[in-house]
Amino acid sequence: MAFIKFNKSELVNIAYSLKREILCANKTGAYCNTSILTCNTRRYHGLLAVTLDRFGGDRYLLLSGVDESLVVKGKQFNLGIHCYGDIYEPRGHKYIVDFSADPVPQITYKVGEMLFRKSILLAQDRDQVLVKYELLSSPAPAKLVLKPFLAFRNTHSLTYQNPDANTKGNAIQGGMAFRMYANFPDLNLQVSDSKAKFIEEPYWNNNITYSDEYRRGFDCREDLLVPGWFECSLKEGGSVVFSASLSQEETAGLKRRFTSGVKAIGEITGYRDQLRRCADSLITDHNGRKKISAGLTWMYTGLLRETLVSLAGLSLYGLDSPKMFEEILDNLIADQQERLFRRTTQVEAPLYMACTLQDYIDYGADEKAVWKKYGVIMRGIIESYLPG
């Protein structure tokens, strides 16, 4: 039985289901975040947002989403859903009959006599999201159409149709590579079906509305580029895996990578296990430097006060790792010299260092060893307040 599950009556109720979200984060600083209907309601929502060093280490949303359609006997069923002002179109949520999230988000659709499932996996050690599509049952073969929606923007911003965007892609193994603007990395979109084809007919999907932003009174509309679409053939019992990645992948191995990725995550065993997983998801290891994300998906990584307040709870009592505690703390000290010892707008933030070190000692660390390593840091912090 799935640990997290929603039924059809809950899922087709937009007022209910749009407030429930999928949130996956990995060690590279990437995330996948959307509603359980895969209808984005906030500017931060999307299938793949990544941390880019070339832009100061901020997160950038590259792939906003993918709209799926099933074509059977010449009839097309659109499974996607977007908000345009007060209108939702297409209304693919009406086909959803089940949602579970153990160990990865799975959405099941029933279209006539067809049963179709979508599973989403964010790779844990690379900037890649994998989506597996399975035709569980069907009276006839089906064509699967996948339309990617590209953003290529900072997660805090919105984007609009403009003449500077490069709407063309380059053919790669099993798909296409897109780079909408200079200095961005390529976004490689590929599918595991060797016979699939990509129809390159770019157009802008305008005035997509993010309902949560609208409710808060923020800018809430943007335009997203649809560069074309994939067409794949599916038979009953068949599957295809879609990959969006900063690296070009071997498409023959996409199904194996998805299967091994799901296996590595494992099933959720209870609330404590789920809490530990959430704690671990807040700790990034981008470029081999561990830091704490202050909050997914809109807050930053490696903030002074937020790291000091949460460090002991996450690394010691959550993950039982003194080594991780010291590694994150050492990285914080190296990165926050100015705010620790000279100038900060959060006047109390450096003083949390004392609380954090005391938490470490209470956990079981040797107090003399802690003072030997971090005593000079505490002295420096206290002395920084002397000038007033």
Feature-to-residue mapping (PLM):
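Terminal accessory carbohydrate-recognition/targeting modules of carbohydrate-active enzymes
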Residues: 1-267, 305, 316-320, 333-334, ...
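Glycine- and aromatic-rich loop/turn segments at beta-sheet edges
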Residues: 107, 280-299, 333-343, 386-388
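Aromatic- and histidine-enriched alpha-helix N-cap/loop-to-helix transition segments
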Residues: 125-128, 232-234, 298-309, 344-355, ...
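An acidic-aromatic substrate-binding cleft motif
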Residues: 251-300
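Active-site acid/base region of carbohydrate-active enzymes
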Residues: 267-279, 361-388
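Alpha-helical support elements that line or immediately flank enzyme active sites
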Residues: 298-332
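Short glycine/serine- and small hydrophobic-enriched flexible loop segments
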Residues: 312-316, 355-365
